[in-house]
Amino acid sequence: MIKRTLTVSLLSLSLGAMFASAGVMAANEPIQPIKAVTPENADMAELGKMLFFDPRLSKSGFISCNSCHNLSMGGTDNITTSIGHKWQQGPINAPTVLNSSMNLAQFWDGRAKDLKEQAAGPIANPKEMASTHEIAEKVVASMPQYRERFKKVFGSDEVTIDRITTAIAQFEETLVTPGSKFDKWLEGDKNALNQDELEGYNLFKGSGCVQCHNGPAVGGSSYQKMGVFKPYETKNPAAGRMDVTGNEADRNVFKVPTLRNIELTYPYFHDGGAATLEQAVETMGRIQLNREFNKDEVSKIVAFLKTLTGDQPDFKLPILPPSNNDTPRSQPYE
């Protein structure tokens, strides 16, 4: 009995030391692992999922949140700039919605303080979904099934843009991607990364990339000028934070993007100017770090970046309520 108790105690100590060692390892790194989340309000998240996928929030009845932030494609659309109402070219590359709850603000220029505020923007943007908040409210309120869900979640069946965006934001907060190879390495699995991936991470750290790309999202927590050492050449007119603040000092200052799932979210940069990860790494080295990475270094950094791809959101697609005679009709050609 004493021997068995001693064995169990030693095993417990061994496991405790192992988990403590993994915790210390992660704590000593500039990047932290992502943890799975449970929605604060599961019913609200389910309602938000329905609204996220509902194209009737747009004037055309064709564009939904998922059109530009496709959850089957890394939470983005893989084109330079998104396509809006009547095939209008969007002004800027669509950032991924995955792990977006970790951002200090939303949009490349940070003009929305949170996901709720961000969700309201595209609905009424004439170059995106091109509807109005009032029409979006009428569309949703026209369907009894939606009103029933609003009553269950909010206590009454009143449909407002505030409630619509609150629900969408709650769903988006669930879109995190834990379980990447790099997270497993951070958590103590020394075999999770191969030699090239590990050397790539050391290059990533040693070159200064982690000064901006750090934390659980590997970015998203700060702003930085695009073109610190050398100007970034682009035809895109976006001026970054200056478009929000009006301060010349904020010209070409953008929110640092997350690098989680980066292999899925091409093309890269606010203008979609880098078609491949290799091109993005080369450009960042040159204009942000004043460093010319050689081919082998680029290859190893890219190998590391691909270890940041986590478990993608896995859920059942919503069945949307049917429109009825009271539902405002789409106007795709107007």
Swiss-Prot record:
Heme c 2 binds at residues 209, 212-213, 284. It catalyses: 2 Fe(II)-[cytochrome c] + H2O2 + 2 H(+) = 2 Fe(III)-[cytochrome c] + 2 H2O. The keyword Cytoplasm does not apply. Residues 315-334 are annotated as: Disordered. It comes from Nitrosomonas europaea (strain ATCC 19718 / CIP 103999 / KCTC 2705 / NBRC 14298). Heme c 1 binds at residues 65, 68-69, 270. Residues 1-26 form the signal peptide. It is an enzyme of class 1 (oxidoreductase). GO terms for cellular component: periplasmic space. Residues 322-334 have a biased composition (Polar residues). Binds 2 heme c groups covalently per subunit. Coiled coil: none annotated. Gene3D superfamilies: Cytochrome c-like domain (1.10.760.10). The keyword DNA-binding does not apply. InterPro entries: Cyt_c-like_dom (IPR009056), Cyt_c-like_dom_sf (IPR036909), Cytochrome_c_Peroxidase/MauG (IPR051395), Di-haem_cyt_c_peroxidsae (IPR004852), MauG/Cytc_peroxidase (IPR026259). One of its GO terms (molecular function) is electron transfer activity. Keywords: Electron transport, Heme, Iron, Metal-binding, Oxidoreductase, Periplasm, Peroxidase, Repeat, Signal, Transport. Its EC number is 1.11.1.5. It is found in: Periplasm. Pfam families: CCP_MauG (PF03150). SUPFAM superfamilies: Cytochrome c. This is Cytochrome c551 peroxidase.
